[in-house]
Design a protein with these regions (language model features):
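Alpha-helical structural modules in large enzymes and assemblies
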Residues: 1-209
Length: 209
């Protein structure tokens, strides 16, 4: 399958290195059409029926699904932003003051990103979908009717019946970005604590009774 795909290399996902995570998603983000065509070719030519079925399913139900394309665009943008700062923080000469500023800047970026970027993400995903001849719309999911509980309000019901697009924005996009912000805030607080400790140690060292 790799022989059918040029440019970026498909890589297994690393659980430890941000750059590896970005590279893995980047390969899919920018070669989705090539990957899909390669999977379809495998489904038509491989002698193993199980492999043919799996390849066809991946090409049709994953890469041929607009929701999957949106998810890949989201992950690529989020991981790229984190990886850029992560690489800067790994510099041997990185000062704690600069590290604090870098993390604080990334938190500010994601705070704005969560409020303004979803429409742009959809446009990027639609462009990819059109190139792949994939319908740039979300599949309608079957709604499960249930009785309203005694403690539920009409507002609760409206949330339950929100559109697929809004559901993905709230339950997927915002969830990912909010997790990133929470993790970065924790890192920021750790750096702030280290900075205060260093200042205290310097003051103690320079203190002459």
């Amino acid at each position: 399958m790799k022989d059918n795909i040029s440019g970026f290399t498909l890589k297994p996902l690393s659980a430890t290195r941000w750059e590896s995570r970005v590279d893995s998603v980047k390969a899919i983000r920018f070669q989705m059409q090539d990957i899909r065509e390669a999977l379809l070719e495998v489904s038509d030519t491989d002698n193993d029926a199980a492999i043919c079925t799996e390849a066809k399913s991946l090409a049709t139900n994953e890469l041929g699904d607009f929701e999957f394309i949106v998810a890949i665009v989201i992950w690529y943008e989020v991981l790229s932003a984190i990886n850029l700062v992560s690489k800067q923080l790994q510099a041997k000469d990185m000062l704690i003051d600069i590290a604090v500023e870098k993390v604080q800047g990334l938190i500010s970026f994601f705070t704005k990103y969560r409020e303004t970027s979803f429409p742009n993400i959809l446009e990027s995903a639609k462009e990819i979908a059109r190139e792949m001849d994939v319908e740039p719309t979300f599949r309608t999911k079957r709604k499960i009717k249930r009785k309203r509980q005694f403690d539920e309000t009409p507002e609760d019901e409206s949330i339950a019946s929100q559109s697929t697009e809004e559901s993905i924005r709230i339950n997927y996009f915002l969830s990912i970005v909010d997790q990133a912000i929470a993790s970065l805030t924790k890192r920021f607080e750790q750096y702030q604590g280290t900075k205060k400790l260093l200042v205290f140690c310097l003051l103690q060292r320079n203190y002459v009774p």
